[in-house]
Amino acid sequence: MKTPVSKLEKFTNDNARVDTAAVQPLPNSRKIYIQGSRADIQVPMREITQSDTATGRGAEKNPPIYVYDTSGPYTDPDTRIDIRHGLPPLREKWIDERGDTEILTGLSSSYSLKRLQDPALTKMRFNLMRPVRHARNGANVTQMHYARRGIITPEMEFIALRENQRRERVADLASNELLNRQHPGQSFGAIIQEWITPEFVRDEVACGRAIIPANINHPETEPMIIGRNFLVKINANIGNSALGSSIQDEVEKMTWAIRWGGDTVMDLSTGKNIHETREWIIRNSPVPIGTVPIYQALEKVDGKAEELTWEIFRDTLIEQAEQGVDYFTIHAGVRLPFIPMTAKRMTGIVSRGGSIMAKWCLAHHQESFLYTHFEDICEIMKAYDVSFSLGDGLRPGSIYDANDEAQFAELKTLGELTEIAWKHDVQVMIEGPGHVPMHLIRENMDLQLKYCHEAPFYTLGPLTTDIAPGYDHITSAIGAAMIGWYGTAMLCYVTPKEHLGLPDKDDVKDGIITYKIAAHAADLAKGHPGAQVRDNALSKARFEFRWNDQFNLSLDPDKAREFHDETLPQEGAKLAHFCSMCGPNFCSMKITQDVRDYAAQQGISETVALQEGMARKANEFIEKGGELYSKQ
């Protein structure tokens, strides 16, 4: 494996390297592929192998556990990764055989052409041009359009297999009653299916309750779905700023995010070379990529919001759609009459996109061009199958401002815009807050379902308190777990650097793991079928002191092993029936196992064994004189 580019070495398309750590399989795991109805539907999953349980009757087999895998080919040792060439175009044949797209002879965006013709960018540019597709004249190429016509696409079948996580392999094993046991959940009206079928995926997309972000110009992406009747997903934000980061850094963050479980990635770059950075990320990403196009549009007018125009924004949308961006955050709900409502707030308008559009509205004293040109935007979206992520530009930036008039006025508008997008068969999800105390979170979910007609909700946290800079991944994960339980379909992660600085690769991992916990906790609370299998497997391994299995089944095997080995580094300690927390004499699980072993030896129940043990101790106390404190 080649060494990553040094921070001191200038990035070029000759020396671009993948992060070595990102291509290592996770411990005791292997990539497997489940074939669908056709040979080119190969759905990736991670198989975690477990060791046997030692019993008095010999070894007891523990089955492998299958988990959702977002890492793409990076963790497949049989795949050669070279980020200079990008990933294989998995969906290219599916897109081509539908016959409703055409290959463009050139780029449609004037800005893209300008960047392509700039010789100064030659060494920085991703140098393998993928063919650029566009819908044939009059065609609509969205997954929603196909679903509404009753078509089950290969993407939909792929998703159904992926969501089921090969659960039938565990469910069919009668010996695995422990693994299959699951507490009933409370789904708050969600339609949770025992098994996900391609027909169910199609129907959820058709009615707008779920989206499949899958731009026809991002054939490298492995299909996934966002909707409250499916597994809760998480998004990772990356991106450079005017003050730091590079293309190499951002590609590393993307590969690191998907390794640990990021279902989608948003490139929020606001610094140099946004266009080139995004191309490298998309060509190497197996997960959907989202952006906020107004950020780049603002750079094109040197940061002067009042100089933005519809024409500049339109060209930016086309530029990014032809690169392969899968969903756009567009703050079309920031309307002129709503801006005065924010005057009474503690923290005003905290959304970057929201503040840009608010400034434009005030400078021109007009409705936002995002709002007035919304149907024009829909025409662009359906020509490439880009999904809307309707931005919450007026989200609360403090607990003080939670659930106020401005926030909910915008939410109603987003519901109106959703209906317009659906008339064009364009897929939509709705962005949500923000900073909200725990007792006000449920209202956000209820009103979103009401105003936005059950379109998927995508929330940033929410942060449940404002007093913990440096720990906002925790303050927000509390709210994320709650709102995920209530029905949010995707959670946008928050890193420990939130409000403080640009996250690095380690911060990305911390944010991902924290939000994987929140999303999984929500799946458990909803009663999502099979959600508890991994918990049960890890608990069984913990009780049986199978330390390596505990590490391998965890969300972060490396950290679990590192913490254990800080005090018990010897390899033999991974076979010990205790850890450094309680030591050998006070381990509750060891004591329970001793009781079970004694009961088995004596041919009695565990209850009787405990009673006999109590009686022996009572006799021992009396025989020693019945003194509360014995003299040495």
Curated annotation (Swiss-Prot):
GO MF annotations in UniProt: 4 iron, 4 sulfur cluster binding; carbon-carbon lyase activity; zinc ion binding
Keyword terms: 4Fe-4S, Iron, Iron-sulfur, Lyase, Metal-binding, S-adenosyl-L-methionine, Thiamine biosynthesis, Zinc
Biological process (GO), any one: thiamine diphosphate biosynthetic process
GO cellular component: cytosol
Cofactor info, note text: Binds 1 [4Fe-4S] cluster per subunit. The cluster is coordinated with 3 cysteines and an exchangeable S-adenosyl-L-methionine.
InterPro entries given in the database record: ThiC, ThiC-associated_dom, ThiC/Bza_core_dom, ThiC/BzaA/B
EC number: 4.1.99.17
Amino-acid positions noted as binding substrate in the UniProt annotation, renumbered to this chain: 237, 266, 295, 331, 351-353, 392-395, 431, 458
Its job: Catalyzes the synthesis of the hydroxymethylpyrimidine phosphate (HMP-P) moiety of thiamine from aminoimidazole ribotide (AIR) in a radical S-adenosyl-L-methionine (SAM)-dependent reaction.
Quaternary assembly: Homodimer.
Similarity comment text for this entry: Belongs to the ThiC family.
Designated name of the protein: Phosphomethylpyrimidine synthase
Source organism per UniProt: Nitrosomonas europaea (strain ATCC 19718 / CIP 103999 / KCTC 2705 / NBRC 14298)
Lineage: Bacteria, Pseudomonadati, Pseudomonadota, Betaproteobacteria, Nitrosomonadales
